[in-house]
C-alpha cells in the first residue's frame, strides 16, 4: 500500500488510464483505512454565484462578476468549453430582475452544458431545523447544569433571542437565505454538496438525465481556472477539499469540495453541528468540524498531516486566483 500522501498525489492528477490495483488503493488516518473512491468523468461540476448587489450590472450583462480582476463568468464559460462532456452547474441567488434572468437563460442557450440553478428552486427542507428548537435545546442544556456552573448571561441571551425570532421565520435555512455576506454563500454551498447529483436532477434541468440523484459533485470557486480536462478523481472515503498553505501553516478551505455521493456522512456530520449550536458557522463548523468528526481527527493528531490526507489538488486547476486581487465584494 502506498502512503496516503503519495496515493493522493498520484490519483489527483486527472489520469484516466489507471490500473485495477490503483482502484483498490486505500489510505489511512487515525488508525482506520479508507478506500480511494472514484469520481468519474461524468460527475457534474458546480460553481456558485450569490449576488448581493445585482443592481451593479449593466443592461444586457449576465449578473456574474466578469472584470479584469475577477473574470468569474469567463472562468465558468472556460470550464464549460474544456469539460464539454460534463454538466456545469451554477447555483445562483439574489434579487435578480426579469431581464437579468433572461441573460441567464441566454447563457444556457449559448452553452448547452451550463445549467443555472436558482437557490429558491431547490428543495433543501430535508436539511432544515426550527431555530426555536435549536435555542430551546441550548437553553435546556444550560438549565441542566448546577446553578453554580450555569452561564446566566448566555442563558439570558438565548431566551431573548428565542423571543425575537420573527413570525414565519422559524427556520435555520430561512435565516441564511436572508443574509447577504459570506455565510450566505457558505451555508448553501454545504447544502448543495449534500444534494450533489440530486441538485441537478430535482430541478428539472434538461440534459441532466444521465446524472444519478445519488451521484457526486465537484464544487469549484469561480476564481479557480481549469486548464484541461480533470478526468477521474479519487478521494478518501469519497470526499476531499481544497487546502490552503500560508507560511507552512495549512488549513481546510471550502474553495473546492469533491464528493462521490449525495448526503456524504462528513457533510451530514457538519450539518448536525450546525443544528446543535446557536452560533455555528457553515465554514468552520459545517464543513471543517464535520470532516474532522467523520475522520476521527482530534487535537492529538498532526493537523498538517490531516490536511495532506484530505487535500484535493489537481495539476489542471489553478486555485484561488482572487488572492492576488482585492475582494469582489
From Swiss-Prot:
Keywords: Glycoprotein, Glycosyltransferase, Host cytoplasm, Manganese, Metal-binding, Secreted, Toxin, Transferase, Virulence. Adopts a GT-A fold and acts as an inverting enzyme that converts the alpha-configuration in the UDP-N-acetyl-alpha-D-glucosamine donor to the beta configuration in the N-linked (GlcNAc) arginine product. GO terms for biological process: symbiont-mediated perturbation of host intracellular transport. It catalyses: L-arginyl-[protein] + UDP-N-acetyl-alpha-D-glucosamine = N(omega)-(N-acetyl-beta-D-glucosaminyl)-L-arginyl-[protein] + UDP + H(+). One of its GO terms (molecular function) is protein-arginine N-acetylglucosaminyltransferase activity. Its cofactor is Mn(2+). This is Protein-arginine N-acetylglucosaminyltransferase NleB1. GO terms for cellular component: extracellular region; host cell cytoplasm. Auto-glycosylated: arginine GlcNAcylation is required for activity toward death domain-containing host target proteins. UDP-N-acetyl-alpha-D-glucosamine binds at residues 48-50, 72, 219-222, 322, 327-329. Belongs to the glycosyltransferase NleB family. A motif (DXD motif) lies at residues 221-223. It comes from Escherichia coli O157:H7.
Amino acid at each position: 500500500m502506498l502512503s496516503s500522501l503519495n496515493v493522493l498525489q498520484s490519483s489527483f492528477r486527472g489520469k484516466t488510464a489507471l490500473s485495477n490495483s490503483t482502484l483498490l488503493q486505500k489510505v489511512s488516518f487515525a488508525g482506520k483505512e479508507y478506500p480511494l473512491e472514484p469520481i468519474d468523468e461524468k460527475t457534474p461540476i458546480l460553481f456558485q454565484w450569490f449576488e448581493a448587489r445585482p443592481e451593479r450590472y449593466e443592461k444586457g450583462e449576465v449578473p456574474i462578476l466578469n472584470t479584469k480582476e475577477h473574470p468569474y463568468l469567463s472562468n465558468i464559460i472556460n470550464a464549460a468549453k474544456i469539460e464539454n462532456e460534463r454538466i456545469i452547474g451554477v447555483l445562483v441567488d439574489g434579487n435578480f430582475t426579469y431581464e437579468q434572468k433572461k441573460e441567464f437563460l441566454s447563457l444556457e442557450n449559448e452553452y448547452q452544458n451550463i445549467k443555472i440553478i436558482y437557490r429558491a428552486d431547490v428543495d433543501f427542507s430535508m436539511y432544515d431545523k426550527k431555530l426555536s428548537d435549536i435555542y430551546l435545546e441550548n437553553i435546556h442544556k444550560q438549565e441542566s447544569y448546577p446553578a453554580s456552573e450555569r452561564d446566566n448571561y448566555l442563558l439570558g441571551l438565548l431566551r431573548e433571542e428565542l423571543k425575537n425570532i420573527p413570525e414565519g421565520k422559524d427556520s435555520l435555512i430561512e435565516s441564511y437565505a436572508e443574509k447577504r455576506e459570506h455565510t450566505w454563500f457558505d451555508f448553501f454551498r454545504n447544502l448543495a454538496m449534500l444534494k450533489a447529483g440530486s441538485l441537478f436532477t430535482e430541478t428539472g434541468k434538461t440534459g441532466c438525465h444521465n446524472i444519478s440523484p445519488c451521484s457526486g459533485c465537484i464544487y469549484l470557486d469561480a476564481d479557480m481556472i481549469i486548464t484541461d480536462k480533470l478526468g477521474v478523481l479519487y478521494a478518501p472515503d469519497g470526499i476531499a477539499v481544497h487546502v490552503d498553505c500560508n507560511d507552512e501553516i495549512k488549513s481546510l478551505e471550502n474553495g473546492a469540495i469533491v464528493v462521490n455521493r449525495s448526503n456524504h456522512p462528513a457533510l451530514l456530520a457538519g450539518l448536525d453541528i450546525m443544528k446543535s449550536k446557536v452560533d455555528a458557522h457553515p465554514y468552520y463548523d459545517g464543513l471543517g468540524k464535520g470532516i474532522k468528526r467523520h475522520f476521527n481527527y482530534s487535537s492529538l493528531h498532526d493537523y498538517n498531516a490531516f490536511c495532506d490526507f484530505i487535500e484535493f489538488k489537481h495539476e489542471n486547476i489553478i486555485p484561488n486566483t482572487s488572492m492576488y486581487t482585492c475582494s469582489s465584494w
